[in-house]
Regions:
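Rossmann-like NAD(P)(H) cofactor-binding subdomain of soluble oxidoreductases
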Residues: 52-134
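Residues at the C-termini of beta-strands that transition into short coil/loop
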Residues: 30, 49, 62, 100, ...
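NAD(P)+-binding Rossmann beta1-loop-alpha1 motif at the extreme N-terminus of oxidoreductases
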Residues: 1-51
Length: 304
């Protein structure tokens, strides 16, 4: 099985790197400047799993051929249009598994690759790429979930699942990836919302009065929107999520907050804006989520 990974940052570099370490046939699609750096320094990951240093297999967009069974997309959502252009020569037999935030990317990918070839994917990880190009993994979260968005056979996903099971990260072949996509969206909206609104980790928020309550209320706003859109979360899962995101001393920051700290562009439209639009379609008021969105609009205006 030949696997192409677009994006060699905190998600693509981490999961693709551990797939390569375990023996999978992995190729990373990169830009020329990034290729020079990776050829010189290799792919480096700092992780509780154990640090990783690899010589990655690299390809430029003009060198691609339609030979890949799986294409993993892990760019920022706002870079998707360029990613689609970069993948033009790779279009063929392969299926696409995007690991992007929100849901807006699926419509674009369906149009370009065909809905039968676009799966659903969720990455649970707290990671970033630092100024030296090293991927830093911050917590125990290290899981890929993927599956078919329609009721079709998992003929290509089963072999990919087998490859993933050889690695050090966790993996699940989902029976309802559409629900899992919503779960991730609501999870990241709460974590990104809280950590950007207050500019710190979850643990720094919950140590103060009302910190835990506002994180829970933010998550429950998102959960209510999901329910109105036909996606209900199990009570036991909700309890687990709330316990995790309000754990005392948690060092977790959303990647959006790390982007803010770097004065970089963020995915607030895809994570907050689209979710608020779903709420408005259902005449649902979500004041905390709206405050998070406004916070990021002010940030965007200041640093654009």
């Amino acid at each position: 099985m030949r696997i192409l990974v677009l994006g060699i940052g905190g998600i693509g570099g981490f999961f693709g790197g551990y797939l390569q370490e375990s023996g999978a046939d992995i190729t990373f699609l990169v830009r020329p400047k990034r290729k020079e750096i990776l050829l010189k320094n290799g792919l480096n990951v700092i992780s509780p799993l154990g640090n990783l240093k690899l010589k990655p297999n690299l390809v430029l967009s003009n060198e691609l051929k339609p030979v890949y069974d799986i294409i993993l997309i892990s760019c920022k959502t706002y870079d998707l249009d360029q990613a689609i252009l970069d993948l033009e020569l790779a279009k063929g037999k392969g299926v696409v598994i995007p690991f992007l935030n929100g849901l807006t990317h699926l419509k674009k990918l369906d149009k370009e690759f065909g809905s039968k070839k676009v799966m659903g994917g969720v990455a649970h990880i707290s990671s970033t790429i630092n100024n030296q190009g090293t991927i830093e993994h911050f917590s125990e979260f290290k899981k890929l979930t993927f599956g078919n968005r329609a009721k079709t056979q998992n003929q290509i996903l089963e072999p990919f699942l087998a490859e993933c099971k050889k690695t050090k990260f966790d993996v699940t072949l989902s029976e309802d990836i559409n629900l899992d996509l919503w779960k991730k969206w609501i999870f990241i909206s709460a974590v990104a919302g809280a950590t950007t609104l207050f500019g710190c980790s979850l643990g720094e928020i919950v140590k103060h009065n009302f910190g835990k309550k506002i994180i829970c209320d933010l998550y429950n706003e998102g959960r209510s929107i999901a329910k109105l859109c036909g996606f209900k979360f199990e009570d036991s899962e909700v309890k687990t999520v709330l316990n995790n995101i309000t754990a005392p001393g948690s060092p977790i920051k959303a990647s959006m907050q790390r982007d803010v700290e770097k004065k970089s562009r963020t995915e607030h439209e895809e994570i907050f804006g689209h979710l608020i639009a779903k709420a408005q379609e259902n005449n649902f008021d979500c004041p905390i989520l709206t405050a998070c969105y406004l916070r990021m609009k002010v940030y965007e205006e200041k640093f654009k």
